[in-house]
């Protein structure tokens, strides 16, 4: 994947980065797919998008504390979401920091700092991830220390917030874990959820004072999906999904 890079000298950078190993970074890249196709190239609009951010003058240059603070304020305004809870400790003065901005179709996917060959993810934009996954998956922040709600073992439904969480909780509560258990591919999962949000049988609809909320049911092979979605402009955002497996009752071990 092509990258645009900014070299930063400040040790304070480490306070903003979340630690991932190179193998985890490879896994992160592997998961960003559109119907199974790996995102490999930067679109022609990427350079213009970078120019529009005002960060183009920092590409492949070292910057001081002032520029670093300005840079961080700019990316903070894009609503960056941490990808992991652990924070890498400070390193020595001689280390160089390279922060790379990834683009796809003119959108910033992620920023990471490369310290000694180890990738340290800072965050990703929810808009970018939602676009990559078909603009129907709502991305929610993962707040460190937030307790997981207890699961109701008596229910045959598994309530799964459709937040694409590229962190530890992605494995624990993500929809993909459920589909893996049921032997459905990631691309099929994405296309199924997209169809469920648009083609399902309407059960109920209402307005919450801001947007229209739809509740639909959709059958896919042995699965029944009850999908709650929100209409925002011309975009359908999936907020919640209850999944029933016709072959068995879902257990706590499913996700």
Swiss-Prot record:
Q: Name one GO cellular component term.
A: extracellular region
Q: Where in the cell is it found?
A: Secreted
> Is Zinc given among the entry's keywords?
no
BP terms from Gene Ontology = defense response to Gram-positive bacterium; killing of cells of another organism
Q: Pro-segment residues?
A: 1-101, 145-255
Q: Mind listing the UniProt keywords for this protein, alphabetically?
A: Antibiotic, Antimicrobial, Bacteriocin, Secreted
Q: What does this protein do?
A: Bacteriocin with specific antibacterial activity against strains of P.freudenreichii. No antibacterial activity was detected against P.acidipropionici, P.jensenii and P.thoenii.
Protein name stated in the entry = Propionicin-F
Native organism: Propionibacterium freudenreichii subsp. freudenreichii
UniProt gene name: pcfA
